[in-house]
């Protein structure tokens, strides 16, 4: 009997991307792809991500279809789908939970630890995007881009901002970071 991997796909990591784990079949695994929430639209997906952040994995619903495949699963691969205590308890043979993101707030870590299940994440996955955003946000703040945009949209035209005394001379800028972005 093949060992089962349950790969739960969503709008962020879709079925085609998850299908790439079929390379593990040569090691005796059977890959089962299941959708986190059937026909989830973009707004529902965003709300689900917010729910994971606010309510945790046990307070965020997931398709009941997922539970059909958990009984003999040794590995669960997920992106943003919650892996609740109920899911972990349903997966009697579970050894590994892998999330394709840096954060692990979508996984009930306490339940995984109690069962001795290894949890694997993808540290640094968003490091380049975070670094890009950080530099862009700094420029936006220094040059008053968001303030000016909002001001113009509401009929204003501010000429002098509170940071004007130093925003014109940004020759010296130091970035200190502790993330994996430096490695990329």
What are these regions (language model features)?
Residues 1-75:
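N-terminal glycine-/charge-rich "phosphate-binding" loop or analogous flexible N-terminal tail
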Residues 4-5, 172-176:
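Residues that mark the start of a beta-strand
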Residues 35, 123, 162-163:
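Short loop/turn and capping residues at structural boundaries
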Residues 64-67, 85, 167:
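Short hydrophobic/charged patches on amphipathic alpha-helices used for structural packing
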Residues 71-154:
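Phosphate/diphosphate ligand-binding glycine-rich loop within oxidoreductases
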Residues 158-174:
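A short, basic/flexible loop-to-alpha-helix module at the beginning of a structural domain
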Residues 177-182:
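Conserved small/polar residues in nucleotide/adenosyl-binding loops
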């Amino acid at each position: 009997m093949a060992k089962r991997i349950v790969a739960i796909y969503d709008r962020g990591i879709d079925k085609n991307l998850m299908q790439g784990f079929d390379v593990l079949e040569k090691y005796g695994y059977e890959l089962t792809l299941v959708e986190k929430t059937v026909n989830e639209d973009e707004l529902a997906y965003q709300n689900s991500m917010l729910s994971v952040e606010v309510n945790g994995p046990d307070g965020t619903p997931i398709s009941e279809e997922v539970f059909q495949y958990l009984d003999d699963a040794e590995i669960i691969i997920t992106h943003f789908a919650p892996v609740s205590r109920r899911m972990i308890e349903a997966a009697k043979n579970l050894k590994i939970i892998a999330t394709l993101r840096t954060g692990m707030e979508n996984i009930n870590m306490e339940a995984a630890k109690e069962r001795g299940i290894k949890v694997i994440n993808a540290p640094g996955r968003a490091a380049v995007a975070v670094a890009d955003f950080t530099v862009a946000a700094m420029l936006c703040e220094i040059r008053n881009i968001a303030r000016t945009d909002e001001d113009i949209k509401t009929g204003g035209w501010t000429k002098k901002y509170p940071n004007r005394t130093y925003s014109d001379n940004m020759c010296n800028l130091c970035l200190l970071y502790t993330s994996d972005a430096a490695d990329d």
